[in-house]
Amino acid sequence: MCDDEVAALVVDNGSGMCKAGFAGDDAPRAVFPSIVGRPRHQGVMVGMGQKDSYVGDEAQSKRGILTLKYPIEHGIVTNWDDMEKIWHHTFYNELRVAPEEHPVLLTEAPLNPKANREKMTQIMFETFNTPAMYVAIQAVLSLYASGRTTGIVLDSGDGVSHTVPIYEGYALPHAILRLDLAGRDLTDYLMKILTERGYSFTTTAEREIVRDIKEKLCYVALDFDQEMATAASSSSLEKSYELPDGQVITIGNERFRCPEALFQPSFLGMESSGIHETTYNSIMKCDIDIRKDLYANTVLSGGTTMYPGIADRMQKEITALAPSTMKIKIIAPPERKYSVWIGGSILASLSTFQQMWISKQEYDESGPSIVHRKCF
């Protein structure tokens, strides 16, 4: 399917980043921040051709003069005008395609409200005139990307984390759990604990620097208390990081204290269970007969699962919670940052999937509610 003329488009809209590309490719062609920026002040330069809004990287680079908004909060679209701008930017500026010539596969958060799926469907057919479209649940696509149809996915991105048990390709809605703790919270927490060390990061520009520190230097400790002791008694865990202005900062126990919040949300002042317990609780909400398959197929997905050491720690924590004879396997594919998109690329290029698309004709006959009958 390298034939871009008929290739389906796959668009994974996350709270933090939008991933887009062509079905059949092994990675997204475009990855950009899910932000829309509007000028704070009237243009000073007359005739500068000032745009009334900027999307993605351009909004990010001009953030000094813009008000930035994220149209997707905790995985769910909350601002449709801005969302439309992001899709427009995706098709015309990033992929440089005419959406009316390609089927479009969109992704949605687990437990996405029904009205939202209908609105996505309506915008695709009425605003972008797509010939066909489909809406797939993000975690299910991640599971497909790992070559499975049964398992439990811990999907953790920038705005939200979910544990989604899936049996024979179907997500089990009664057992899906959501945790409002994800990448953005960890970045904020790292800003806070670096401030305690005497480094001050406050602006949105500095937040991006901290996000980079987090992605490059943080890791999950197998045993938190032991790691804290090691960090206190030696400098073996210290790493240095050069800021854009050339100043070098040193970071020690912050490296593993930051992602530890995933396992101990109390660090962030949250009362919820950690990701290990949430995964276990999700499994326990499932039928007793399928739990064995879920324990043995626990798949990590999303950018916030990219910390070194996270799979070993999950293995250790879930082993402590599960029955002692249970076989537990944590699958952490190296490409898991993009596994939702990759799963979409695989799905949309399957010959057996071609009958699953919602066509323009079906939409015209049934209206937006067709999405509930065809996408589940």
From Swiss-Prot:
Residue numbers covered by the propeptide annotation in the UniProt entry: 1-2
Superkingdom classification of source: Eukaryota
Pfam families: Actin (PF00022)
Transmembrane annotation, as ranges: none
Catalytic EC class: hydrolase
The protein's Enzyme Commission number: 3.6.4.-
SUPFAM superfamilies: Actin-like ATPase domain (SSF53067)
SMART domains, sorted: ACTIN (SM00268)
Residues recorded as bearing Methionine sulfoxide in the entry: 45, 48
Entry keyword set: Acetylation, ATP-binding, Cytoplasm, Cytoskeleton, Hydrolase, Nucleotide-binding, Oxidation
Keyword Glycosyltransferase: no
Post-translational modification: Oxidation of Met-45 to form methionine sulfoxide promotes actin filament depolymerization. Methionine sulfoxide is produced stereospecifically, but it is not known whether the (S)-S-oxide or the (R)-S-oxide is produced.
Modification N-acetylaspartate occurs at: 3
Protein location: Cytoplasm, Cytoskeleton
Coiled coil (UniProt feature): none
Catalytic function, reaction form: ATP + H2O = ADP + phosphate + H(+)
PROSITE patterns, per database record: ACTINS_1, ACTINS_2, ACTINS_ACT_LIKE
Keyword Secreted annotated: no
Gene Ontology annotations for the cellular component aspect, listed alphabetically: cytoplasm; cytoskeleton
UniProt-recorded Gene Ontology molecular function terms: ATP binding; hydrolase activity
Protein purpose: Actins are highly conserved proteins that are involved in various types of cell motility and are ubiquitously expressed in all eukaryotic cells.
Protein family according to the UniProt entry: Belongs to the actin family.
This protein's name: Actin-3
Organism, scientific name: Limulus polyphemus (Atlantic horseshoe crab)
